[in-house]
Amino acid sequence: PVYLLGFAVCFQGFQIALSKITAEKKAAGIVDAAKTTLRLTIILTMVLCFIFSFFCFVYADKICAVFLHEPACVPCLRLAVLVLPFVGVKNCIHGYCLGVGNSYVPALSLCLEQISRVSSIFLLSIFLIEKMPVAAFLAVCGMAVGEIVSFFFTVIYYLLHKKSDHVKAGSGSTVSKRSLCYELLSLGIPLTLNSLSVTLLQSVQSILIPMMLYRFYGNRYRSVEIYGILSGMVLPFIMFPSTITN
């Protein structure tokens, strides 16, 4: 829940705003303004990610004890928040690519992320499983590897293709950084607040359900196991038809 909260606070709303602004500037033929918006979004995202990651890394003990009621999650949380800046930059570039109509870069990046995640978890489970502080740390390591691989692929692709845009620049039309920043914030802040409210409700659900299961079973590990089965196997199977209809 804390990691997903970082998504909502740091870049989720601004990624959507970036896609919208980029599409507008592309339609107007102002390529430089779209690229400037991307740079502004990356800077803003990096600042928010570093602040959030620093806070969570330093106070991981208190966060896990007070909110998660599971001190064993401390190494998992600390590793997860260290990856957050990479995820933020990657998602900003994905938003820019979607804005210019290039959807295969985010799709390919997601495929590489999943392949890297599963492969790294498999290899770590063979060679380093006994050295893991907790079993869940293995999954977090796989998540971190997948996100970093996806980050490098996305950044390298953008650096190689940033000069080969299909959109021709407008005839001398420019937009000031101040107006772009205002447009980004005016769109991004409401979207961020909306995403934050949804994520907070989901986080409360993710925390309360295991707590209530613990009250019922009287065993912390059994309650977490049941919750993992419900959220990871039962609910995705029940909700699978909605992935087709949506």
Locations of regions flagged by a protein language model:
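Small-residue-rich midsections of specific transmembrane alpha-helices
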Residues: 1-23, 85, 203, 231-246
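Transmembrane-helix boundary and interhelical linker motifs in polytopic inner-membrane proteins
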Residues: 9-43, 99-104, 245-246
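Interfacial transmembrane-helix starts/ends
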Residues: 30-47, 55, 181, 185, ...
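Short membrane-interface helical motifs at transmembrane helix boundaries
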Residues: 51-71
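Alpha-helical transmembrane segments of multi-pass membrane proteins
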Residues: 69-92, 230
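Membrane-interface junctions at transmembrane-helix termini in multi-pass inner-membrane proteins
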Residues: 86-109
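Hydrophobic alpha-helical transmembrane segments
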Residues: 109-123, 131-161, 231
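Transmembrane helical elements of multi-pass membrane transporters/channels
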Residues: 146, 150, 154, 158, ...
